[in-house]
């Protein structure tokens, strides 16, 4: 069952400002091949290259999820935080949007223990925190909030991701280095002031404008959802029947009950 990848046009990329790079003096020469020219001291990204490269990146996201893989969205800069979390949640994937904790991938065992601690705190506090003093409870709530901020997006990941999707490779260089070490492929938006080194699937484009970030995140989440649909199709799940059964549960009445009425 071959689902279509999310559609996007050159015009959408232009409207979102994907073509605006950084000031020419801040450029990274390694990005020279993806630069179309300059305008008013700003490098302009060659969108005729971005289009097929973005398409290839979306294909990888889709294929990874279709094989049952997990995608980890990484974007900790202020203007990426919400878009990254929303897109990952919408497509049942995972995210780091607070601060990359060194060792998140390379020291997964320790990170898993912190996730277990977060789940234990949730349980204790969720059940009314019986027998705790006010002070103990406050300390627990503080620890819970801290862990939730840094690990909330990966608490259900259950193991290493199969693919990273990164916004701003300069800021997230730690994440990329860890993925490289473990052989986890990286899809990333790479601006004109960055190096594409260590990125397996480069998307040349602006990594600062909120509209551009929202567009990448939306497309990647839709590609992941396409992958889930393909995975269900391959597993022989009849999506029509699945929707009908969900509908049935919502109305709370099965055919037998209707017949008995």
UniProtKB/Swiss-Prot annotation:
GO terms for molecular function: structural constituent of ribosome. GO terms for cellular component: cytosolic small ribosomal subunit. The keyword Phosphoprotein does not apply. The keyword Ribonucleoprotein applies. One of its GO terms (biological process) is translation. Keywords: Ribonucleoprotein, Ribosomal protein. CDD domains: RPS2. Coiled coil: none annotated. InterPro entries: Ribosomal_uS2 (IPR001865), Ribosomal_uS2_bac/mit/plastid (IPR005706), Ribosomal_uS2_CS (IPR018130), Ribosomal_uS2_flav_dom_sf (IPR023591). Transmembrane segments: none annotated. SUPFAM superfamilies: Ribosomal protein S2 (SSF52313). Pfam families: Ribosomal_S2. HAMAP family: Ribosomal_uS2_B. Belongs to the universal ribosomal protein uS2 family. This is Small ribosomal subunit protein uS2. It comes from Paracoccus denitrificans (strain Pd 1222).
